[in-house]
Design a protein with these regions (language model features):
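Boundary regions of SH3-family modules and the immediately adjacent low-complexity/disordered segments
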Residues: 1-12, 60-108
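SH3/SH3-like beta-barrel superfamily modules
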Residues: 39-72
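Short, basic/aromatic beta-hairpin or loop at an interaction surface
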Residues: 15-27, 136-153
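Active-site nucleophilic cysteine motif
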Residues: 121-138, 142-145
Length: 227
């Protein structure tokens, strides 16, 4: 019987067992093919859901995200652990940690990087991966994808060209009324940091300003401090 601290081996792969990564790994949306959907860094925990020939279906414990991991990537690189979930944080505690979130995102921008769809480990990340890792750096776990982050947060009643209700650390969501497709973090005075692809004029992390008359307007403005 496996005990805590055992490294993951073929005979220990059981549905429901929990493990902690000893290395960064890629997560895929399907049981085969090059379909990167997320990444999980060293130290993250997961529950095994099922096993296929070359991949295992897992659920990351910090955010509940489901994906497939290559067996070769995790065998001998994950330790048995107990079931775990993040502790709830008060709005006051989250607000206290926001300067650290912003500082982490600034450091990430300063490192050479490119936009990577599904990227959630440094240096190359997608928009929501950057947000998740910035908050996780301060012990705050938010959902993985932009549309999930939008649903997770509390709306702020911001008015066009009036940034007075937006605070540094608020998340800004872009897209349509039907679905959010992009996210950035507010720095103050309408400026925000985000990771975007080359088709948006960048290929990595940068700073832009809100333009309410843009043809791709911000769909809504949400704040983590109002959880």
């Amino acid at each position: 019987m496996a005990t805590l601290g055992n490294l993951l081996a073929p005979d220990l792969i059981q549905a429901g067992s929990c493990w902690q990564l000893c290395a960064d790994v890629n997560g895929y949306s399907r049981s085969d093919g090059e379909s990167l959907t997320t990444q999980a860094c060293h130290g993250r925990r997961f529950r095994i859901l099922e096993k296929q020939r070359k991949r295992i279906a897992i659920q990351l414990l910090e955010d509940g995200y489901r994906c497939w991991l290559e067996l070769e990537a995790v065998l001998g690189r994950a330790e048995r652990c107990e079931v775990w979930r993040p502790s709830p944080l008060s709005a006051t505690e989250i607000e206290r940690r926001l300067p650290g979130v912003l500082a982490w995102s600034e450091i990430a921008q300063q490192r050479p990087n490119v936009y990577l769809w599904g990227g959630t480990t440094e240096p190359d990340m997608d928009c929501s991966g950057l947000m998740q890792m910035a908050f996780a750096s301060q012990g705050i776990w938010i959902p993985r994808d932009a549309y999930q982050q939008e649903r997770f947060c509390q709306p702020v009643a911001a008015l066009p060209d009036d940034h007075s209700l937006l605070r540094p650390g608020d998340l800004l969501f872009f897209g349509t009324r039907r679905r959010c497709t992009h996210v950035g973090i507010h720095l103050g005075e309408g400026r925000y940091r985000h990771s975007s692809g080359a088709d948006h004029g960048r290929n990595g992390i940068g700073i832009d300003s809100l333009q309410w008359s843009d043809t791709h307007p911000v769909a809504c403005h949400l704040s983590l401090i109002h959880i």
